[in-house]
């Protein structure tokens, strides 16, 4: 994928980004053979899906971003490749958390923090400015399990599919941006 062709990425260090993607793909291939971390076929499409939110939302004022159910790193790892914000990834699966820790070391990501625990069991040291999650669960249960990390200023950015409209019933303050079948939901 040629990232330099996208206007919304023009202000980022794309050479460094592409080097980190190469490391990511090599590590994912290695870990996937043993641990079966993901069944995704087109990694490039999923990387683009992870960073497309930068076309719709400005992350510059956020100090701490929490990603819930980080799995193989989509979307938070790729945002951390591009941004300087602190990313806190919550992944209770030991194999996936080990992959994320290895990736952090290999890519020298000082802005990435991995927690091998469920977010609802986390005893808060910080409040997240932004909480992200990609297709983990319905919106209302997600809001509930994140109560230790959020305050009245926390913004949720969710990568969802077409079901998002039903999930948002009785929720008022949100925006949805679309890219193909993906719905990027921003809850304020």
UniProtKB/Swiss-Prot annotation:
Gene3D superfamilies (UniProt xref): Vaccinia Virus protein VP39
Keyword Methyltransferase: yes
Subcellular location: Cytoplasm
Domain of life: Bacteria
A Pfam family the protein falls into: GidB
EC id: 2.1.1.170
Family (UniProt): Belongs to the methyltransferase superfamily. RNA methyltransferase RsmG family.
Protein name: Ribosomal RNA small subunit methyltransferase G
Native source species: Campylobacter jejuni subsp. jejuni serotype O:6 (strain 81116 / NCTC 11828)
């Amino acid at each position: 994928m040629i990232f330099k062709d996208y206007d919304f990425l023009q202000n980022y260090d794309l050479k460094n980004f592409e080097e980190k993607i190469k490391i990511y793909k090599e590590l994912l291939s290695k870990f996937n053979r043993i641990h079966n971390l993901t069944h995704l076929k087109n990694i490039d499409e999923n990387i683009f899906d992870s960073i497309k939110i930068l076309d719709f939302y400005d992350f510059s004022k956020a100090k701490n971003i929490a990603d819930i159910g980080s799995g193989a790193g989509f979307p938070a790892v790729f945002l951390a490749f591009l941004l300087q914000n602190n990313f806190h990834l919550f992944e209770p699966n030991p194999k996936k958390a080990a992959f994320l820790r290895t990736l952090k070391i290999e890519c020298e990501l000082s802005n990435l923090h991995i927690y091998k625990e469920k977010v609802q069991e986390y005893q808060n040291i910080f409040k997240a400015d932004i909480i992200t999650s990609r297709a983990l669960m319905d919106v209302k249960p997600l809001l509930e399990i994140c109560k230790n990390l959020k305050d009245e200023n926390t913004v949720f950015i969710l990568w969802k599919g077409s079901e998002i409209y039903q999930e948002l019933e009785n929720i008022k303050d949100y925006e949805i941006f679309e890219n193909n079948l993906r719905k990027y939901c921003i809850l304020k």
